[in-house]
Each structure stands twice: as structure tokens, then as C-alpha cells.
Amino acid sequence: MSQEYLDFELPIAELEAKIESLRSVCAQDGKIDLEDEINRLQHKSQELTKKTFANLDAWQVSRMARHPNRPYTLDYIEHIFTEFDELAGDRAFADDKAIVGGIARLDGRPVMVIGHQKGRVTKEKVKRNFGMPAPEGYRKALRLMEMAERFKMPIITFIDTPGAYPGIGAEERGQAEAIARNLREMSQLSVPIICTVIGEGGSGGALAIGVGDKVNMLQYSTYSVISPEGCASILWKSAEKASMAAEVMGLTAQRLKELNLIDGIVDEPLGGAHRDVLKIAHNLKQQILADLAELDSLTTEALLERRYERLMSYGYV
């Protein structure tokens, strides 16, 4: 997969292009030694990357959360779990490809893994409906979660959606009901639930698989009731004010942690999760294992009581 850069990364991209050009020259003529120059440019690129990513604003973080190279749910399943067996369909209407889920092993332990799934090329994007689930997707997720409860398997969810699909067909099939039912049922499941926002956490479409005992976010992910563009269109009648909206919405992991709306922030590799998929998968796996160890120490009654108290603590009176 070729590396893509956002506009604020262009100076980094130019340095990386120079480095690749020098490497190409060396490969074509083995007599030319440009190692020192390549090392100098690599050091310069790394320092520039550190400086750039140390000062990202909320709008830049929002765009990082949507980066076209960013790892998706199936990427994390491949690198964190073993023996993944995908399960399909809601047993009522259809199989929604915007939600993937199934049984897997986490260090040998059976778990149920569920997450939003986007596509990278046009055909796959259409197949996955750009990561926007219809009601049957959320009903599939609930079916798998209820199965996990029956077999006493922890539930691991990965959140990455711009929102639930707002099409007419989805509304006719009960989009709001499907989301509401998931919220209610997840709050009562008797097994540990660990949720992680890996990209976009868009409104009810994210919440429908986001009610958990532990809710974490990757460093450059976002979680909000609406997109910055949508917020700007409502408040200022122009999507061009998206950067301003992002700042006031408090959608970054750091801000949500300050508000005690999430439990932890998983550090990403320098430059974002897509720069080193193995490293971010390792970091996320360690977070999940630590959370699971903590939740395993609780009785079922204590787990449910803690989850209830967590939900009741949200908001202001």
C-alpha cells in the first residue's frame, strides 16, 4: 500500500521523496555512495515529523482519524488475534458488510470480536458502505454479543464509523430502534466488554457497539455526536468552518479523557497508526489484555454495577 500524506504532512512527504530518490540512484549505480546524505535526510524527516505531530490541532486529528492508510478492524484482528472465524448475518434480513465480527482467540482465550469495517478501494468502499452500518449490521452485532454472553466470552469491539447509515431503507427497517436496543442490551450483558475507537467515532453509529466496561481511544482517533463538517454546516451554515467546529467540539482523545468519558489513550507510532501497523497492534493488544485482567477480577454483579455507575456518571446536572 503506497503511503499517502495529508496537506500538513507535505514537508515530510517532500523529504521522504528525496530519500527515495537517493536510494533509487544508489540502487541503479552501486558505485555511488549517498549513505551519509540519506541518513542526514532521514534524521531531518524524523525531527520534522516529531515537531509536526507534537502540535496537531483538533481538525488535523480529525483528518488523521480518517487517513486512507489507517488500519481498520480486520487489520487489527489479523495482528492481535488468532483463529478468527467470521460470523455473518442478523438472522432477520441480511448480512451487513459494514460490521464484521466473529469468534477469535486472544492469547489462546476465546473472545468475541466485533467492529466497523471500511474499504480502501472504490469497490470495497461500496461493499462496506463506507463503514456506515444499516440496522441489520447492528442486529448482527447484538446477535454475536448475545452469543458471547451465552458462552461466557469477553466482547472486544473496534469503533470506526462516520455514523450509522441514514438512508431511507435503513430508516424503514428501524435504524433508531436497532441502535437503541444495542445500547440497552449492552448495558446488561454479563460478560466483560472492552471498546476501542480506532478511527472515527461517529455519534449513535459508534455508540451502538460502544457501551463497555472499558472504553479506550487511539491517540489520533475522534469521538463525537456529529462530524466537524456537519456541526459547522448547522452552526455557521458552511462546512468550511469545520476546523473551528472541531476545536469547540472536544472530540479528541485527550479532551475526552479530561472529561472522564473514556478510560485510556493508546499511543500511536510517530506519524500515526498507519506508519507502523505492528507497533500499534502491539500497543492496543497490551491495553486490551490489561483491561481484561482487571475486569476478570470482578464478580458478575460487581461488573454490572460498575457498568451502571459508569453510564449514570455521564453528563451534567
UniProtKB/Swiss-Prot annotation:
Domain of life of the organism encoding this protein: Bacteria
Disulfide bonds: none
GO function terms (MF aspect): acetyl-CoA carboxylase activity; ATP binding; carboxyl- or carbamoyltransferase activity
Enzyme category, top tier: transferase
Catalyses which reaction(s): N(6)-carboxybiotinyl-L-lysyl-[protein] + acetyl-CoA = N(6)-biotinyl-L-lysyl-[protein] + malonyl-CoA
Subcellular location: Cytoplasm
Principal subcellular localization: cytoplasm
A Pfam cross-reference name: ACCA
GO CC entries: acetyl-CoA carboxylase complex
Pathway assigned in UniProt: Lipid metabolism; malonyl-CoA biosynthesis; malonyl-CoA from acetyl-CoA: step 1/1
Family of the protein in this entry: Belongs to the AccA family.
Subunit structure of this chain's protein: Acetyl-CoA carboxylase is a heterohexamer composed of biotin carboxyl carrier protein (AccB), biotin carboxylase (AccC) and two subunits each of ACCase subunit alpha (AccA) and ACCase subunit beta (AccD).
Protein task: Component of the acetyl coenzyme A carboxylase (ACC) complex. First, biotin carboxylase catalyzes the carboxylation of biotin on its carrier protein (BCCP) and then the CO(2) group is transferred by the carboxyltransferase to acetyl-CoA to form malonyl-CoA.
NCBIfam families cross-referenced by the UniProt entry: accA (TIGR00513), AccA_sub (NF041504), PRK05724.1 (NF004344)
Name by which UniProt lists this protein: Acetyl-coenzyme A carboxylase carboxyl transferase subunit alpha
Gene: accA
